[in-house]
Amino acid sequence: MTTGTDVRISLRLLFYELWDNNAKLTKNKTTTPTTSKTTSKILFNSKRTTPTHGYDADYIAELSNNFEFAGFTAPTPHNIRKAFTRLKIMFERMNRYPDEIFLSRHRMLGFVIYQPETSGPIPAFHPKCKFYKLSDNHTHDEKIEIVKNHILNGEIVKTVDLKIDQSFESYYYDKSNAQASQKFLASMHTCDFSFLSFPYINDLTATELGLLPEWAAILLSYMKIINVRGIYNDVVECIDPSQQFCVFEIIGSLTGISNGHFWSVLNDRRSMDVIAKEVEKIALDNQPFXKDGNLNHLLFNSINLSDPLNFNIFHYSFKLKIFPTTLNPLDDLVLLRMKDLIKAFNAGNDVQVIGNKCIGKTRLTAELKKKYLNLLIIDSDDYGKFITLLLNNCPNLFLNNDFEINDEVFEEEIFNVTVIEYANVIRDGTIVIETFFERLMFEIMSLNLTNGEYDVDAIFHSFNARFHAIVNSSMIGYRLFFTKFRKLMFDNFNYTQVLHFVHSYSELSFYPHCVAYITLEPSYNPCCLLYKNRVKRFLSITRSDKGVSSELFLHQFYEKFTTKVNPTPVFVFRYYFGLTNGLSISELALDENT
C-alpha cells in the first residue's frame, strides 16, 4: 500500500458529483423543508432522488480504488454530495472556509441551528449528537469565536441571535415537520469532512475549471493540490528577455570547417566571457547521440541558422565557439502558431504535433509524461504497432495484397480485445512491438529492387495505396482505433486530454478530436539517426557499403506529405511548454563517463 505522500487523488473524480454524466448539476435551486428562510438554498441533482442509490457502479468502484491506491479511505458519493452542499452554504455565509478542516482530518463538523424561544426543545438527531446553547451574555465578537470553536468540535450550536445565524452555516428546526427535520439534520451532521485534508491532483481541464461555481473554485485554494497540467503555470508568452541569447558555431576538429551555426537561449546567468572560455574546453568526440549532454543536449536546445547538421554518427569530432547576440530568429508566424496551440491546449482541447521519424518524439514524450501526468501522449507509431498486434490475434485478417478485410475470420470483438491488449502493452512499457508499416515498406522495397537499385517512385506509389487502404478502413482504420483507444484510456486511467504525434500532414484528418496542430522541425538531419538505427533493426538490408532501411524510406515517404511552411523548431516547443529553460552549459560539458 502506498501512502498519500507519494500518490495523489484525482480531483476530477472527487468533483464527479458536480456533473451530470460529467455535466453540471442542475442549476434549479430547491429549498428543503428544513432550510431556514435566512439560510442558503441547496443545490441538488434532480436525477438522483435517493441518497444511497442512483450512483454509477463504475464510478463508485473507481472512486474507492483511487483513494485506496493513494492510501486513504474513500468517502461515499453520498457523503461527498452532503459535504459539497454544506461547503456551498458555508461559503455563501462566511465568504471563506475554516482553515482547520483542511489541515487535519475533521470527521464531524457542527453547524448553527436558529431556535426561537417559542420553538421548544430539540431532540438529539443521532447518538453522537451534542448541542451547545449560545448564551446572550457575550459580545458579538466573543459569540463568533465561541461558535467557531464549538463547530470545529463537532457540536451543534443553538442560538436565538439572527446575526450569528447569518454568519455561519445554519439551519432551522421545523417542529411542525419534526421527523423530516431530524432526518435531514442528522444526515448533514454525520457528514465526514476528513477527505478535504487529503492530497489531490488537479486533473480538470481549463474549461472544466472555468465552469466550477465560485464556492468550488475557492475551495481549491484551501485544499492540498498539485497541478498536473503544469502548462497553466509554466507556459510562457515569449522568450524571457532577461536571458542571454547566443550563437554556437560547430567546427569539425579534423577539417577546421564550420558545420553549422545554432541560436539558443542560455540557462546560465554568468557573464558571456566566462561561458565562452568554458565552451572552448568542450570537445564533442565520439559521444553516443543517445546520451544526455554534448551534441544531443546542444541540438535539442537550439535552433539551426543554416542547413540541419549532417554528421557521421559513428565518428565525429567537433569544436565549439559561442558568441553573444541580440538576434532572435524566431518567425512571428511560428510563434503565433505555437501560441494558438497552447491556447487550445489550455482550453482542454486535444492537439496534434506533426513530427517525422527521428526528430526526438521519444524524448519529448518522456518529458511531457513526467510534467503532465494526466495527458495521454499518443505516439505516431501506435497505430502501426496496434496493427501488428491485431495480425498476431487474427493472422488471416487480410484477404490479399490490397488489404481487403477477411469478413469470415474477423470480428469486431477481436478488434476491441486487441485495443485493450495494446493499452496494457503501453501501460507496461517494457514490451517491444515493431510497427506494421516498417514491415510493409520493407516488403515493397524488396519487390522493387533491381540490380541493386530501388525504384523509389514505384515504392512510394505502392506503399501509398496500401497505407491509405488500411488507415481508411471502416473496420480497422486509424479513426476507429484512436477513438476506441482514447475512450479506453480516459475511462480507466484518469487521462483528460490528448497530445497526438503524427508523422505527416495527411494523418491529421484521421484523428477526430484535435482542434490545433503544429509541425516540428529538428536542428539536425534525422537521416543521421536512421543510419545509426539500421544496425539494430531486423528489417535492415545492405546495399553496397551503406545501410538502407525501411525506416529511411518511411521518413522520405512522410516527408512528401508534410508541409514545411513555418515549421516550429523542437527547442521552441520545449521552451514554450516548460520542458526546458534553455541551454545549460554544464550539461553541454558532460562527457561520456559522467
Swiss-Prot record:
Its main location: virion. GO terms for cellular component: host cell cytoplasm; host cytoskeleton; virion component. Keywords: Host cytoplasm, Host cytoskeleton, Virion. It is found in: Virion; Host cytoplasm, Host cytoskeleton. It comes from the Viruses. The keyword Transmembrane does not apply. The keyword Cytoplasm does not apply. Minor inner capsid component. Displays NTPase and RNA 5'-triphosphatase (RTPase) activities. May function as a cofactor of polymerase VP1. Associates with microtubules and plays a role in the formation, structural organization and morphology of viral inclusions, where the assembly of cores and the replication of viral RNA occur. This is Microtubule-associated protein VP8.
